[in-house]
Amino acid sequence: KLGKEMELFTIIDEVGAGLPLFYPKGALLRKTIEVFISEQQEKRGYKDIWIPHITKGTLYEISGHLDKYDAMYTPMMIDEHDYYVKPMNCPHFMMLYKTLQHSYKELPVRYTCTTTNYRNEKSGELSGLTRVRSLTQDDCHVFARPDQIENEIDLMLDMIKEVYAGFGLSDFYVRISLRDSNNNDKYIGTDNVWDTAENALRAIVKKTGWKYEEAEDEAAFYGPKLDFMFKDAIGRQWQLSTIQLDFNLPERFDLNYIDESNEKIRPVVIHRAVLGSTERFIGVMIEHFAGAFPLWLSPVQVKILPISEKFADYAEKVRAEISDAGIRVEMDDSNESLGKRIRVAKMEKIPFILVLGEKEVEAGTVTVEMRGKDKGETHQLQDFIKYTLSDIEKKAIW
């Protein structure tokens, strides 16, 4: 409901269930989140790749998805081969790594790609943005030596911690998602390999001091996971970030690196998505903040309301200066009464509303109504811009 009211996204029957479309404000929200994630990845040494959205079935035979994964769409026939829209990205990462020769000195190789996957979810399980058929992931795969596992997962945990702080997310625990030990048919790989991977994740999580629990039958078919379970403002639980430790896909794709003795050695793969999926993350954030996003995340950060038409020139000057500073700003100079325009801006949950009239024009100031406060305050425009930029930069939560 909020998504449509705030002009963020919509789902239309003619397009299809579970296939959201994003309005400009929603697209801007997505972009803001994805740029934040990209910045976090870049400073930690992740390298962007790009992969196509359809793939020959041969790739999914190698990976095991055709046998073990049940959310794939019916294939299309192209040049006498079955092609699938991709439900996940792991096999493409494996193939990119495999096409190049790697030395032990190069590892870890950190590949990342923000891309959309398509999954044949059952109609009854679809729900807003939190369960969709087209889902975008900030997907990362790290190819590492066994002695690098702990450091690489620590790097991922550090990124998750910093990202969650930016969104003000603190009520979460880690679920160690294990295999169903009574049903090996659901998985690829030997018990030995699974035991090694599960024990490694246990040790790493215990060292963090974070709350955690173990859950059987929640692992991916190729390896155990750390799933970050978040509780929103009204107590509902959501899975967001995930880290997966994988000894099996490197085996199936025959991946290797050359060690110091010039021998071929199998790398370990660590899968990671901080948002989980962009769509679900946005859906959870909409509900958690009831649409009142933190300032840095708000699609519109400032709304300018001239009291009447004769103050429009000053309002436009203020708008231009705020916009030039890199702050997202809109002006409502419609013929509606000031009271109604203020009510609309508050319904839109705009962080800052600037009301401009005779007093502000004469003094060269702005009167600022901050979301959640009853009274406006008057400031010099440059002072307002300065502290707004400061709050955006430090990702203040209020």
Label for each model-derived stretch:
Residues 1-398:
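NTP/phosphate- and nucleic-acid-binding module
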